Structures are given as C-alpha cells and as structure tokens.
C-alpha cells in the first residue's frame, strides 16, 4: 500500500452540507436559520443582547491578581499582652485560649501598640520592630517560631 492509495474508512466522512440550494436539497429556502429576525438575515456578534447592555459590560473588569503566597497574620498588640493574667511563655496557643486570636493555625504577629510594664516572654510567628523593642526594653524575650 502506498500513500496515494490511502482512503478514509467507509462511513467515516460526510459530505459538507450545502445550504440554500433549493427545496429538494433539504436545506433550501431558509437554510436552517428559521424564519425572519436578525439572526436569519445577518450575523450577530458574540455577546450581543439586542441592544441591552451585555453581560460582559454589566459585570465590569476584574483588575489585578491575588497573590497565592500572601501570608495573612492574626495580629495582637503588646498592650493586650501586657493585660494578660498569665505569667508563663506567651505562645499562639495561649493567645487562642484567651481569645485574643481567632483562627486555628493562622500565624500570629505581635504589633507595637500599647505599653509594656512587665517582662513578657513571647513566642510568635512575626514581630513588628516597635513591638520587639518594647518587649525587650521591659526585660522580656521574643522568639520567632515557624
């Protein structure tokens, strides 16, 4: 068998339908477009809704993107830590038990709003520079956990 002898399998190819070529052809007269109306007479562009403001204009554009690597911290200020009736090492679990942090498993960041009047020993996932300075100035310790 040679290349010029190849043929498609019987019944695998259908001839192209020629529309609008007389009633006897089966697709004559309206050529499968139905009767009357804009779609019967000419093309209608995709998304056209008859003059009504189309969906893609009603919804507006979505700009920018969402960073899949963004870390969203649960934040606690040092002023709130100072008020805690707790003397041990302050960890995210301790903060959850005192309901200063909501989400389980979310990383905790300590921010520097408020005053520290006693030595605090704090473990958290992140500290702001002002929080770190206030805790250390009061004689406490900061430890970054992962």
From Swiss-Prot:
Keywords: Ribonucleoprotein, Ribosomal protein, RNA-binding, rRNA-binding. Residues 23-35 have a biased composition (Gly residues). One of its GO terms (cellular component) is cytosolic large ribosomal subunit. GO terms for biological process: translation. It holds the Pfam family Ribosomal_L27A. GO terms for molecular function: rRNA binding; structural constituent of ribosome. Residues 1-51 are annotated as: Disordered. InterPro entries: Ribosomal_uL15 (IPR030878), Ribosomal_uL15/eL18 (IPR021131), Ribosomal_uL15/eL18_sf (IPR036227), Ribosomal_uL15_bac-type (IPR005749), Ribosomal_uL15_CS (IPR001196). The keyword NAD does not apply. Binds to the 23S rRNA. Belongs to the universal ribosomal protein uL15 family. Part of the 50S ribosomal subunit. This is Large ribosomal subunit protein uL15. The gene is rplO.
């Amino acid at each position: 068998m040679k290349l010029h002898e190849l043929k498609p399998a019987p019944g695998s190819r259908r001839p192209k339908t020629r529309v609008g070529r007389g009633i006897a052809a089966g697709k004559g007269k309206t050529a499968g477009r139905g009767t009357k109306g804009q779609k019967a007479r000419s093309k209608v562009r995709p998304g056209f809704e008859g003059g009504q403001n189309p969906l893609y204009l009603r919804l507006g554009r979505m700009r920018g993107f969402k960073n899949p690597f963004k870390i969203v911290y649960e934040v606690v200020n040092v002023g709130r830590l100072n008020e805690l009736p707790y003397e041990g090492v302050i960890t995210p679990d301790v903060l959850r038990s005192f309901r200063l942090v909501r989400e389980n498993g979310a990383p905790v960041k300590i921010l520097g709003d408020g005053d520290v009047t006693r030595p605090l020993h704090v473990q958290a996932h992140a500290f702001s520079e002002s929080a770190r300075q206030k805790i250390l100035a009061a004689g406490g310790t900061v430890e970054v956990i992962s």
